[in-house]
Each structure stands twice: as C-alpha cells, then as structure tokens.
C-alpha cells in the first residue's frame, strides 16, 4: 500500500465537539491509519531572503494513512471530523509520500 499525508488546514479551533469525534474516525479507518499525527501551533515562516513572519498559513495538523490509491484516501477522508463545519473554510489536503 502507498502512504499519504493528510494536512489539516483552516482557522484554528478550540477543542470542542468536532475534536471529540476524532477518535471515532481513527477507529473507523482502522489499519489505514499509519500515524495519528499531531496538531500544530506557534509556527514561523522563514523566507529565502532571511526574513521571517510569525503568521504562517493556517496549517493545523497532520496524519498519515495508507491506501491503494488517492481515490481510496478521498473516500476515507470524506467524513473526517475536521471537515464537519461544512462551510468550506476547513480542508484536508492529501499528498502521496514517496517510498523511502
């Protein structure tokens, strides 16, 4: 199986109802979950000219899953709790990871 990184992007949200749904989603995808990942906070942007910015993109976390192809990952992610607000502000970006 191939491995894929899920990047969670959207406005920062305090722990709440959607966060409580994550364990159920992790259980639902079962063996497809390779790395539960981690939330991200307090980022910094370092540019090639040496300048910095303490306002990085709205990247909130990541997970790693395994599947036969990206279409299977899309099916796994369609009901992810991070997308539950359903207003388009939240997204999960999917990237295939090369074999090591």
Residue ranges and their predicted role:
Residues 1-100:
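Conserved, structured core segments of small domains
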């Amino acid at each position: 199986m191939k491995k894929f990184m899920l990047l969670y992007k959207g406005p920062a949200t305090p722990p709440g109802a959607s966060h409580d749904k994550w364990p159920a989603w992790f259980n639902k995808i079962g063996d497809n979950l390779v790395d539960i990942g981690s939330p991200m906070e307090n980022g910094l942007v370092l540019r090639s000219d040496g300048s910095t910015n303490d306002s990085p993109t709205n990247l909130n976390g990541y997970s790693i899953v395994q599947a036969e192809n990206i279409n299977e990952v899309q099916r796994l992610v369609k009901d992810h709790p991070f997308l539950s607000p359903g207003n388009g502000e939240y997204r999960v970006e999917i990237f295939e990871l090369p074999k090591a």
